[in-house]
Amino acid sequence: MRSLLVGLALLSGCNLVKGPPRDHECRATLRTIIGHEDAFFSRAQRYSVHPAEVGFAPSTGNRYLYLFAPKGDLTRRDELPSPPLEESVGYGPDTRKRGVLLEDVLTRLPADLRALAGLEGECPRCELTVLCAGNLDDDPDLDVWSISTKDRAEAPRGTPIHHLRDL
């Protein structure tokens, strides 16, 4: 019976070995970021576009760009210099492990999506949107998600939205 179930799972395309899909990192990390931002807001009555201020840093080997504001310097994950953490508005992908350059992701990120990132309104009546962008295969197109502290037409607060689907 067990071999029949495993056979059916394999025929259906079920992935029992590889683990979660590659886009899971992005969605899970965006939810973690909103958790950090909500905790920071409860203490400071504001959100921050500086990941270090809210206690966020992606794990080693991250595939994605995490963008907290449409403009500003980003923390690099390679040998090139980065801004001081307190000035950074995001993190680039881990170039050492993934071979993806921050500039490659930034140049392919559509301007209208990049403009979604950042603060909206005056705190404490403000909202924050954070982007996650990366290329999961070897074509020029990106996958882009966002998460926000506000309710949006496509999803309630704290729920990632997939804006560009590359796969």
Task: Locate the predicted segments by residue.
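Extracellular/periplasmic head regions of type IV pilus-like filament subunits
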Residues: 35-139, 153, 166-167
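Alpha-helical interaction segments
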Residues: 4, 30-31, 54-57
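Low-complexity, S/T/G/P-rich flexible repeat/linker segments used as non-globular hinges
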Residues: 143-167
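Amphipathic alpha-helical segments typified by the pilin-like N-terminal helix
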Residues: 11-36, 41
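Sec-dependent bacterial lipoprotein signal peptides
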Residues: 1-12
